[in-house]
C-alpha cells in the first residue's frame, strides 16, 4: 500500500478440499472497532466516525507514523512533502502526512457508497448497517462452508472478510 493506493487486491492461489482455487483478498484499512491508531496519535489527527470509518485529518497530522506502528496490518503510510508541518514546524516530526483508506468518507457524507464498493464487478464488497452486513456475511460463509474474519479478531473491525479458507 502507498499513500496513493488505499486498496490493494492480493491474488492468492490456495487448495480447498483438494481443489486449486484463486482467492482475491483486498488489503486496506480494516476500520477497527477500537482503533489503536486513533488513540495513540499525539495530535488527535485520527478518529472513528459514527459511520464506522477511521479517518486521518491531514490538517492535523504531523506524520509521526505512530498510527502505522500500532496498526496490526501496517496500513497507514506516509506521504512526504505535504502537510501542515511544512508551514508550521518544517523541521519537526515525520516529514509528511499519514494516509489510508477512509471508506471514501466524503462520498459517505453525501450518501454515496465508497468507490471500491461501487466499482466491484462481483459485488463482493458491501456497506451498510452492521447487522445487515453480518447477516449477509454469515449467509455467504454458510453457502461456501467458509469463515468470517473481523467480527471479533483484533478487537473487531468494521470490515468483514468471508473466505472458503480459514484465516489462521
Where are these regions (language model features)?
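Non-ligating segments of multi-cofactor redox enzymes
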Residues: 1-168
Amino acid at each position: 500500500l502507498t499513500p496513493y493506493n488505499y486498496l490493494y487486491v492480493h491474488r492468492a492461489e490456495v487448495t480447498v478440499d483438494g481443489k486449486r482455487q484463486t482467492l482475491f483478498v483486498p488489503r486496506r484499512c480494516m476500520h477497527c472497532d477500537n482503533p489503536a491508531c486513533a488513540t495513540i496519535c499525539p495530535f488527535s489527527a485520527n478518529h472513528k466516525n459514527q459511520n464506522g470509518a477511521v479517518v486521518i485529518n491531514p490538517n492535523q497530522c504531523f506524520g509521526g507514523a505512530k498510527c502505522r506502528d500500532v496498526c496490526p496490518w501496517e496500513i497507514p503510510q506516509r506521504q512526504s512533502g505535504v502537510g501542515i508541518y511544512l508551514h508550521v514546524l518544517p523541521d519537526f516530526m515525520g516529514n509528511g502526512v499519514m494516509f489510508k483508506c477512509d471508506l471514501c468518507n466524503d462520498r459517505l457524507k453525501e450518501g454515496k457508497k465508497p468507490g471500491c464498493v461501487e466499482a466491484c464487478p462481483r459485488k463482493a464488497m458491501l456497506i451498510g448497517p452492521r447487522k445487515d452486513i453480518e447477516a449477509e456475511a454469515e449467509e455467504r460463509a454458510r453457502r461456501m462452508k467458509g469463515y468470517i474474519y473481523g467480527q471479533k479478531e483484533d478487537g473487531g473491525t468494521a470490515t468483514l472478510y468471508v473466505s472458503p479458507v480459514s484465516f489462521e
